[in-house]
Design a protein with these regions (language model features):
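Primarily recognizes the serine-hydrolase "nucleophile elbow" in alpha/beta-hydrolase
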Residues: 76-129
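Short, surface-exposed "cap/lid" segments of acyl-processing enzymes
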Residues: 1-49
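The feature captures the conserved acid-bearing segment of alpha/beta-hydrolase catalytic domains
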Residues: 121-185, 189
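Active-site loop/turn elements of alpha/beta-hydrolase fold enzymes
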Residues: 39-43, 116, 193
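Alpha/beta-hydrolase active-site loop
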Residues: 49-50, 54-81
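Short acidic/His/Gly/Ser-rich catalytic and metal-binding motifs that mark active-site loops
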Residues: 45-51, 120-124
Length: 221
């Protein structure tokens, strides 16, 4: 019961959804010293379902919120059962969910979002991902920002338990933008990779999570 727990959320349209979870945490030979819980978001059963979901910003926001609330339910259940420290992580989409939970609940002992930042709206408005989004004018862009932004709420939270990882050459989760958004007091680990190559760096991602388990959780408990 005193063993640490990692709650992990998948990335966008992983196929199968638990692919990165298995590669980083649960695969043969990974030997992660923690209880592992995998979370899958709505609208991610197929690429078609995901693309249809992001046609409306409110659907995407609902997906994020649903995952964050589900994770909070898992945190409470772990507490009720007397489990040890809880680390919340996820990659890309899952990293944004981790940041969202950190912002609105902050009930876990530590957070390690991978390849994600606090400004999810930037992905849709300013990165190469913009071509998938129909935002032809300032009014439409404003709707996306209002639906997805949680920057003000993030700024009001203590970040002593936040240990993110970014990829310096990421064209989706732009390093300079997201690094600045985390704030000067948040220690951000950096991979010298892009988004896809960073997501495939399973050993490096696992090493980061193990470092948070070994050092980060001790700092926050």
């Amino acid at each position: 019961p005193n063993k640490a727990t990692i709650i992990y959320h998948h990335g966008t349209n992983e196929n199968p959804p638990e692919m990165s979870f298995n590669k980083i945490l649960a695969g043969k030979g990974t030997a992660v010293p923690a209880n592992l819980i995998f979370v899958r978001a709505p609208f991610n059963s197929s690429l078609r379902a995901f693309v249809a979901s992001i046609a409306q910003a409110r659907n995407y926001a609902a997906m994020l919120a649903t995952s964050a609330v589900l994770i909070e339910g898992l945190v409470r259940r772990c507490r009720e059962q007397g489990q040890g420290p809880i680390l919340i992580s996820g990659i890309s989409l899952g990293g944004f969910v981790a940041n969202l939970h950190h912002t609105y609940f902050n009930s876990a002992d530590a957070y390690a979002p991978l390849l994600a930042g606090p400004l999810i709206e930037d992905v849709f408005l300013n990165s190469v991902y913009r071509k998938l989004v129909a935002a032809p004018d300032a009014e439409a862009e404003g709707r996306i920002t209002r639906a997805l932004s949680f920057a003000a709420e993030y700024a009001a939270v203590s970040h002593h338990n936040l240990f993110p990882l970014l990829a310096r050459h990421d064209q989706y989760i732009r390093y300079d933008v997201q690094r600045a958004a985390y704030g000067p007091n948040v220690p951000v680990a950096v991979l010298e990779k892009g988004h896809v190559t960073g997501a495939l760096a399973h050993d490096a991602l696992r090493a980061h999570l193990l470092a948070v388990l070994n050092a980060g959780l001790k700092q926050t408990t």
